[in-house]
Amino acid sequence: MTNIRKSHPLLKIMNDAFIDLPAPSNISSWWNFGSLLGVCLIMQILTGLFLAMHYTSDTTTAFSSVAHICRDVNYGWIIRYLHANGASMFFICLYIHVGRGLYYGSYTFSETWNVGMVLLFTVMATAFMGYVLPWGQMSFWGATVITNLLSAIPYIGTTLVEWIWGGFSVDKATLTRFFAFHFILPFIITALVAVHLLFLHETGSNNPTGISSDMDKIPFHPYYTIKDILGALLLMLALLILVLFSPDLLGDPDNYTPANPLNTPPHIKPEWYFLFAYAILRSIPNKLGGVLALVLSILILAFIPALHTSKQRSMTFRPISQCLFWVLVADLLTLTWIGGQPVEPPFIMIGQVASILYFSLILILMPVAGIIENRILKW
């Protein structure tokens, strides 16, 4: 008799994805972050659902409702901080996941990579809208500044911004629609994750060597299920340490002041996970140029498969490319730091140099390194 998990129409799908899935025997801990992102997504949806039960999306009561959740709702404070810091964990895992894909050449699975890019944009949009909901000073001014960037689009820009705002400024209509979008997008993300996995399971996982592992596969369960559970426990440990010991470490003190359209904060800045893109935006003096650079800083990932010049897939055996990859990581950390600094010397110059280096590394230096490595190996 066939095992029910192999014959039942629904269980068969689960079985082929999480139990009997053939997986490479040598994938390292860098491959854990996909499952950790799944854990983050489930946790964000659950905590978000409980927050939505008590939150009101009205400009007069939004700030108070968040305070009410923290003060009066049973364990409301931990749900709120798990949700806020869970977003930070989500982005840490997301950036490591993308970095792993870059390092090991996983971008050659073009469908998986492209769906992943759509996912990245969607998660960023969701996080941005979520930051607006508490209706603090940084929520209001962040929403005003970032949505205003669309006015740089020629001809239709101003109309587009007012259409998004639902009026002539960020107000009640904006907050209500942002709440609606913030609620629906995670479910769209979940559907995209299913598509992402569907495409991944068509080809199978990559591995650190970058060569085919068809001759050496092991079942996903129990080997990688136990490995993923360990990763999830470590993630939850890190998150709980953050939430229970310093929940406001990654937040902005300005967001504890209710939104006031008549009072601009001294330094308007987004959450830490958007600072690298914000630094690129600010490093260009022209508004439209800045907006294009901002979009391209993420959209550039779409061009990476076309820029792959090496005969080898992974960077494991390519020391020049490895050096450039870690320079790129250091550059992104520098941009993140600059994004949080005021617009004054020497930060302006550092930001501009780091922005030029970011695009140069991806568009010029890494493809050239691939060609040089081919020549060295006489390939």
Curated annotation (Swiss-Prot):
Residues where heme b b562 binds: 83, 182
Oligomer and partners: The cytochrome bc1 complex contains 11 subunits: 3 respiratory subunits (MT-CYB, CYC1 and UQCRFS1), 2 core proteins (UQCRC1 and UQCRC2) and 6 low-molecular weight proteins (UQCRH/QCR6, UQCRB/QCR7, UQCRQ/QCR8, UQCR10/QCR9, UQCR11/QCR10 and a cleavage product of UQCRFS1). This cytochrome bc1 complex then forms a dimer.
Gene Ontology biological-process annotations: mitochondrial electron transport, ubiquinol to cytochrome c
Membrane topology designation: Multi-pass membrane protein
Signal peptide from the UniProt entry: none
Location(s), subcellular: Mitochondrion inner membrane
Organism the protein comes from: Camelus dromedarius
Function: Component of the ubiquinol-cytochrome c reductase complex (complex III or cytochrome b-c1 complex) that is part of the mitochondrial respiratory chain. The b-c1 complex mediates electron transfer from ubiquinol to cytochrome c. Contributes to the generation of a proton gradient across the mitochondrial membrane that is then used for ATP synthesis.
MF-aspect GO terms: metal ion binding; ubiquinol-cytochrome-c reductase activity
Positions bound to heme b b566: 97, 196
Protein name, as recorded: Cytochrome b
Segments passing through the bilayer: 33-53, 77-98, 113-133, 178-198, 226-246, 288-308, 320-340, 347-367
Disulfides per UniProt: none
InterPro entries noted in UniProt: Cyt_b/b6_C, Cyt_b/b6_C_sf, Cyt_b/b6_N, Cytb/b6-like_sf, Cytochrome_b, Cytochrome_b_C_euk/bac, Cytochrome_b_N_euk/bac, Di-haem_cyt_TM
UniProt keywords, alphabetically: Electron transport, Heme, Iron, Membrane, Metal-binding, Mitochondrion, Mitochondrion inner membrane, Respiratory chain, Transmembrane, Transmembrane helix, Transport, Ubiquinone
Residues reported to bind a ubiquinone: 201
One GO cellular component, as annotated: mitochondrial inner membrane
Cofactor requirement: heme b
Protein family per UniProt: Belongs to the cytochrome b family.
Gene3D superfamilies: Cytochrome Bc1 Complex, Chain C
Cofactor binding, per record: Binds 2 heme b groups non-covalently.
Note: Heme 1 (or BL or b562) is low-potential and absorbs at about 562 nm, and heme 2 (or BH or b566) is high-potential and absorbs at about 566 nm.
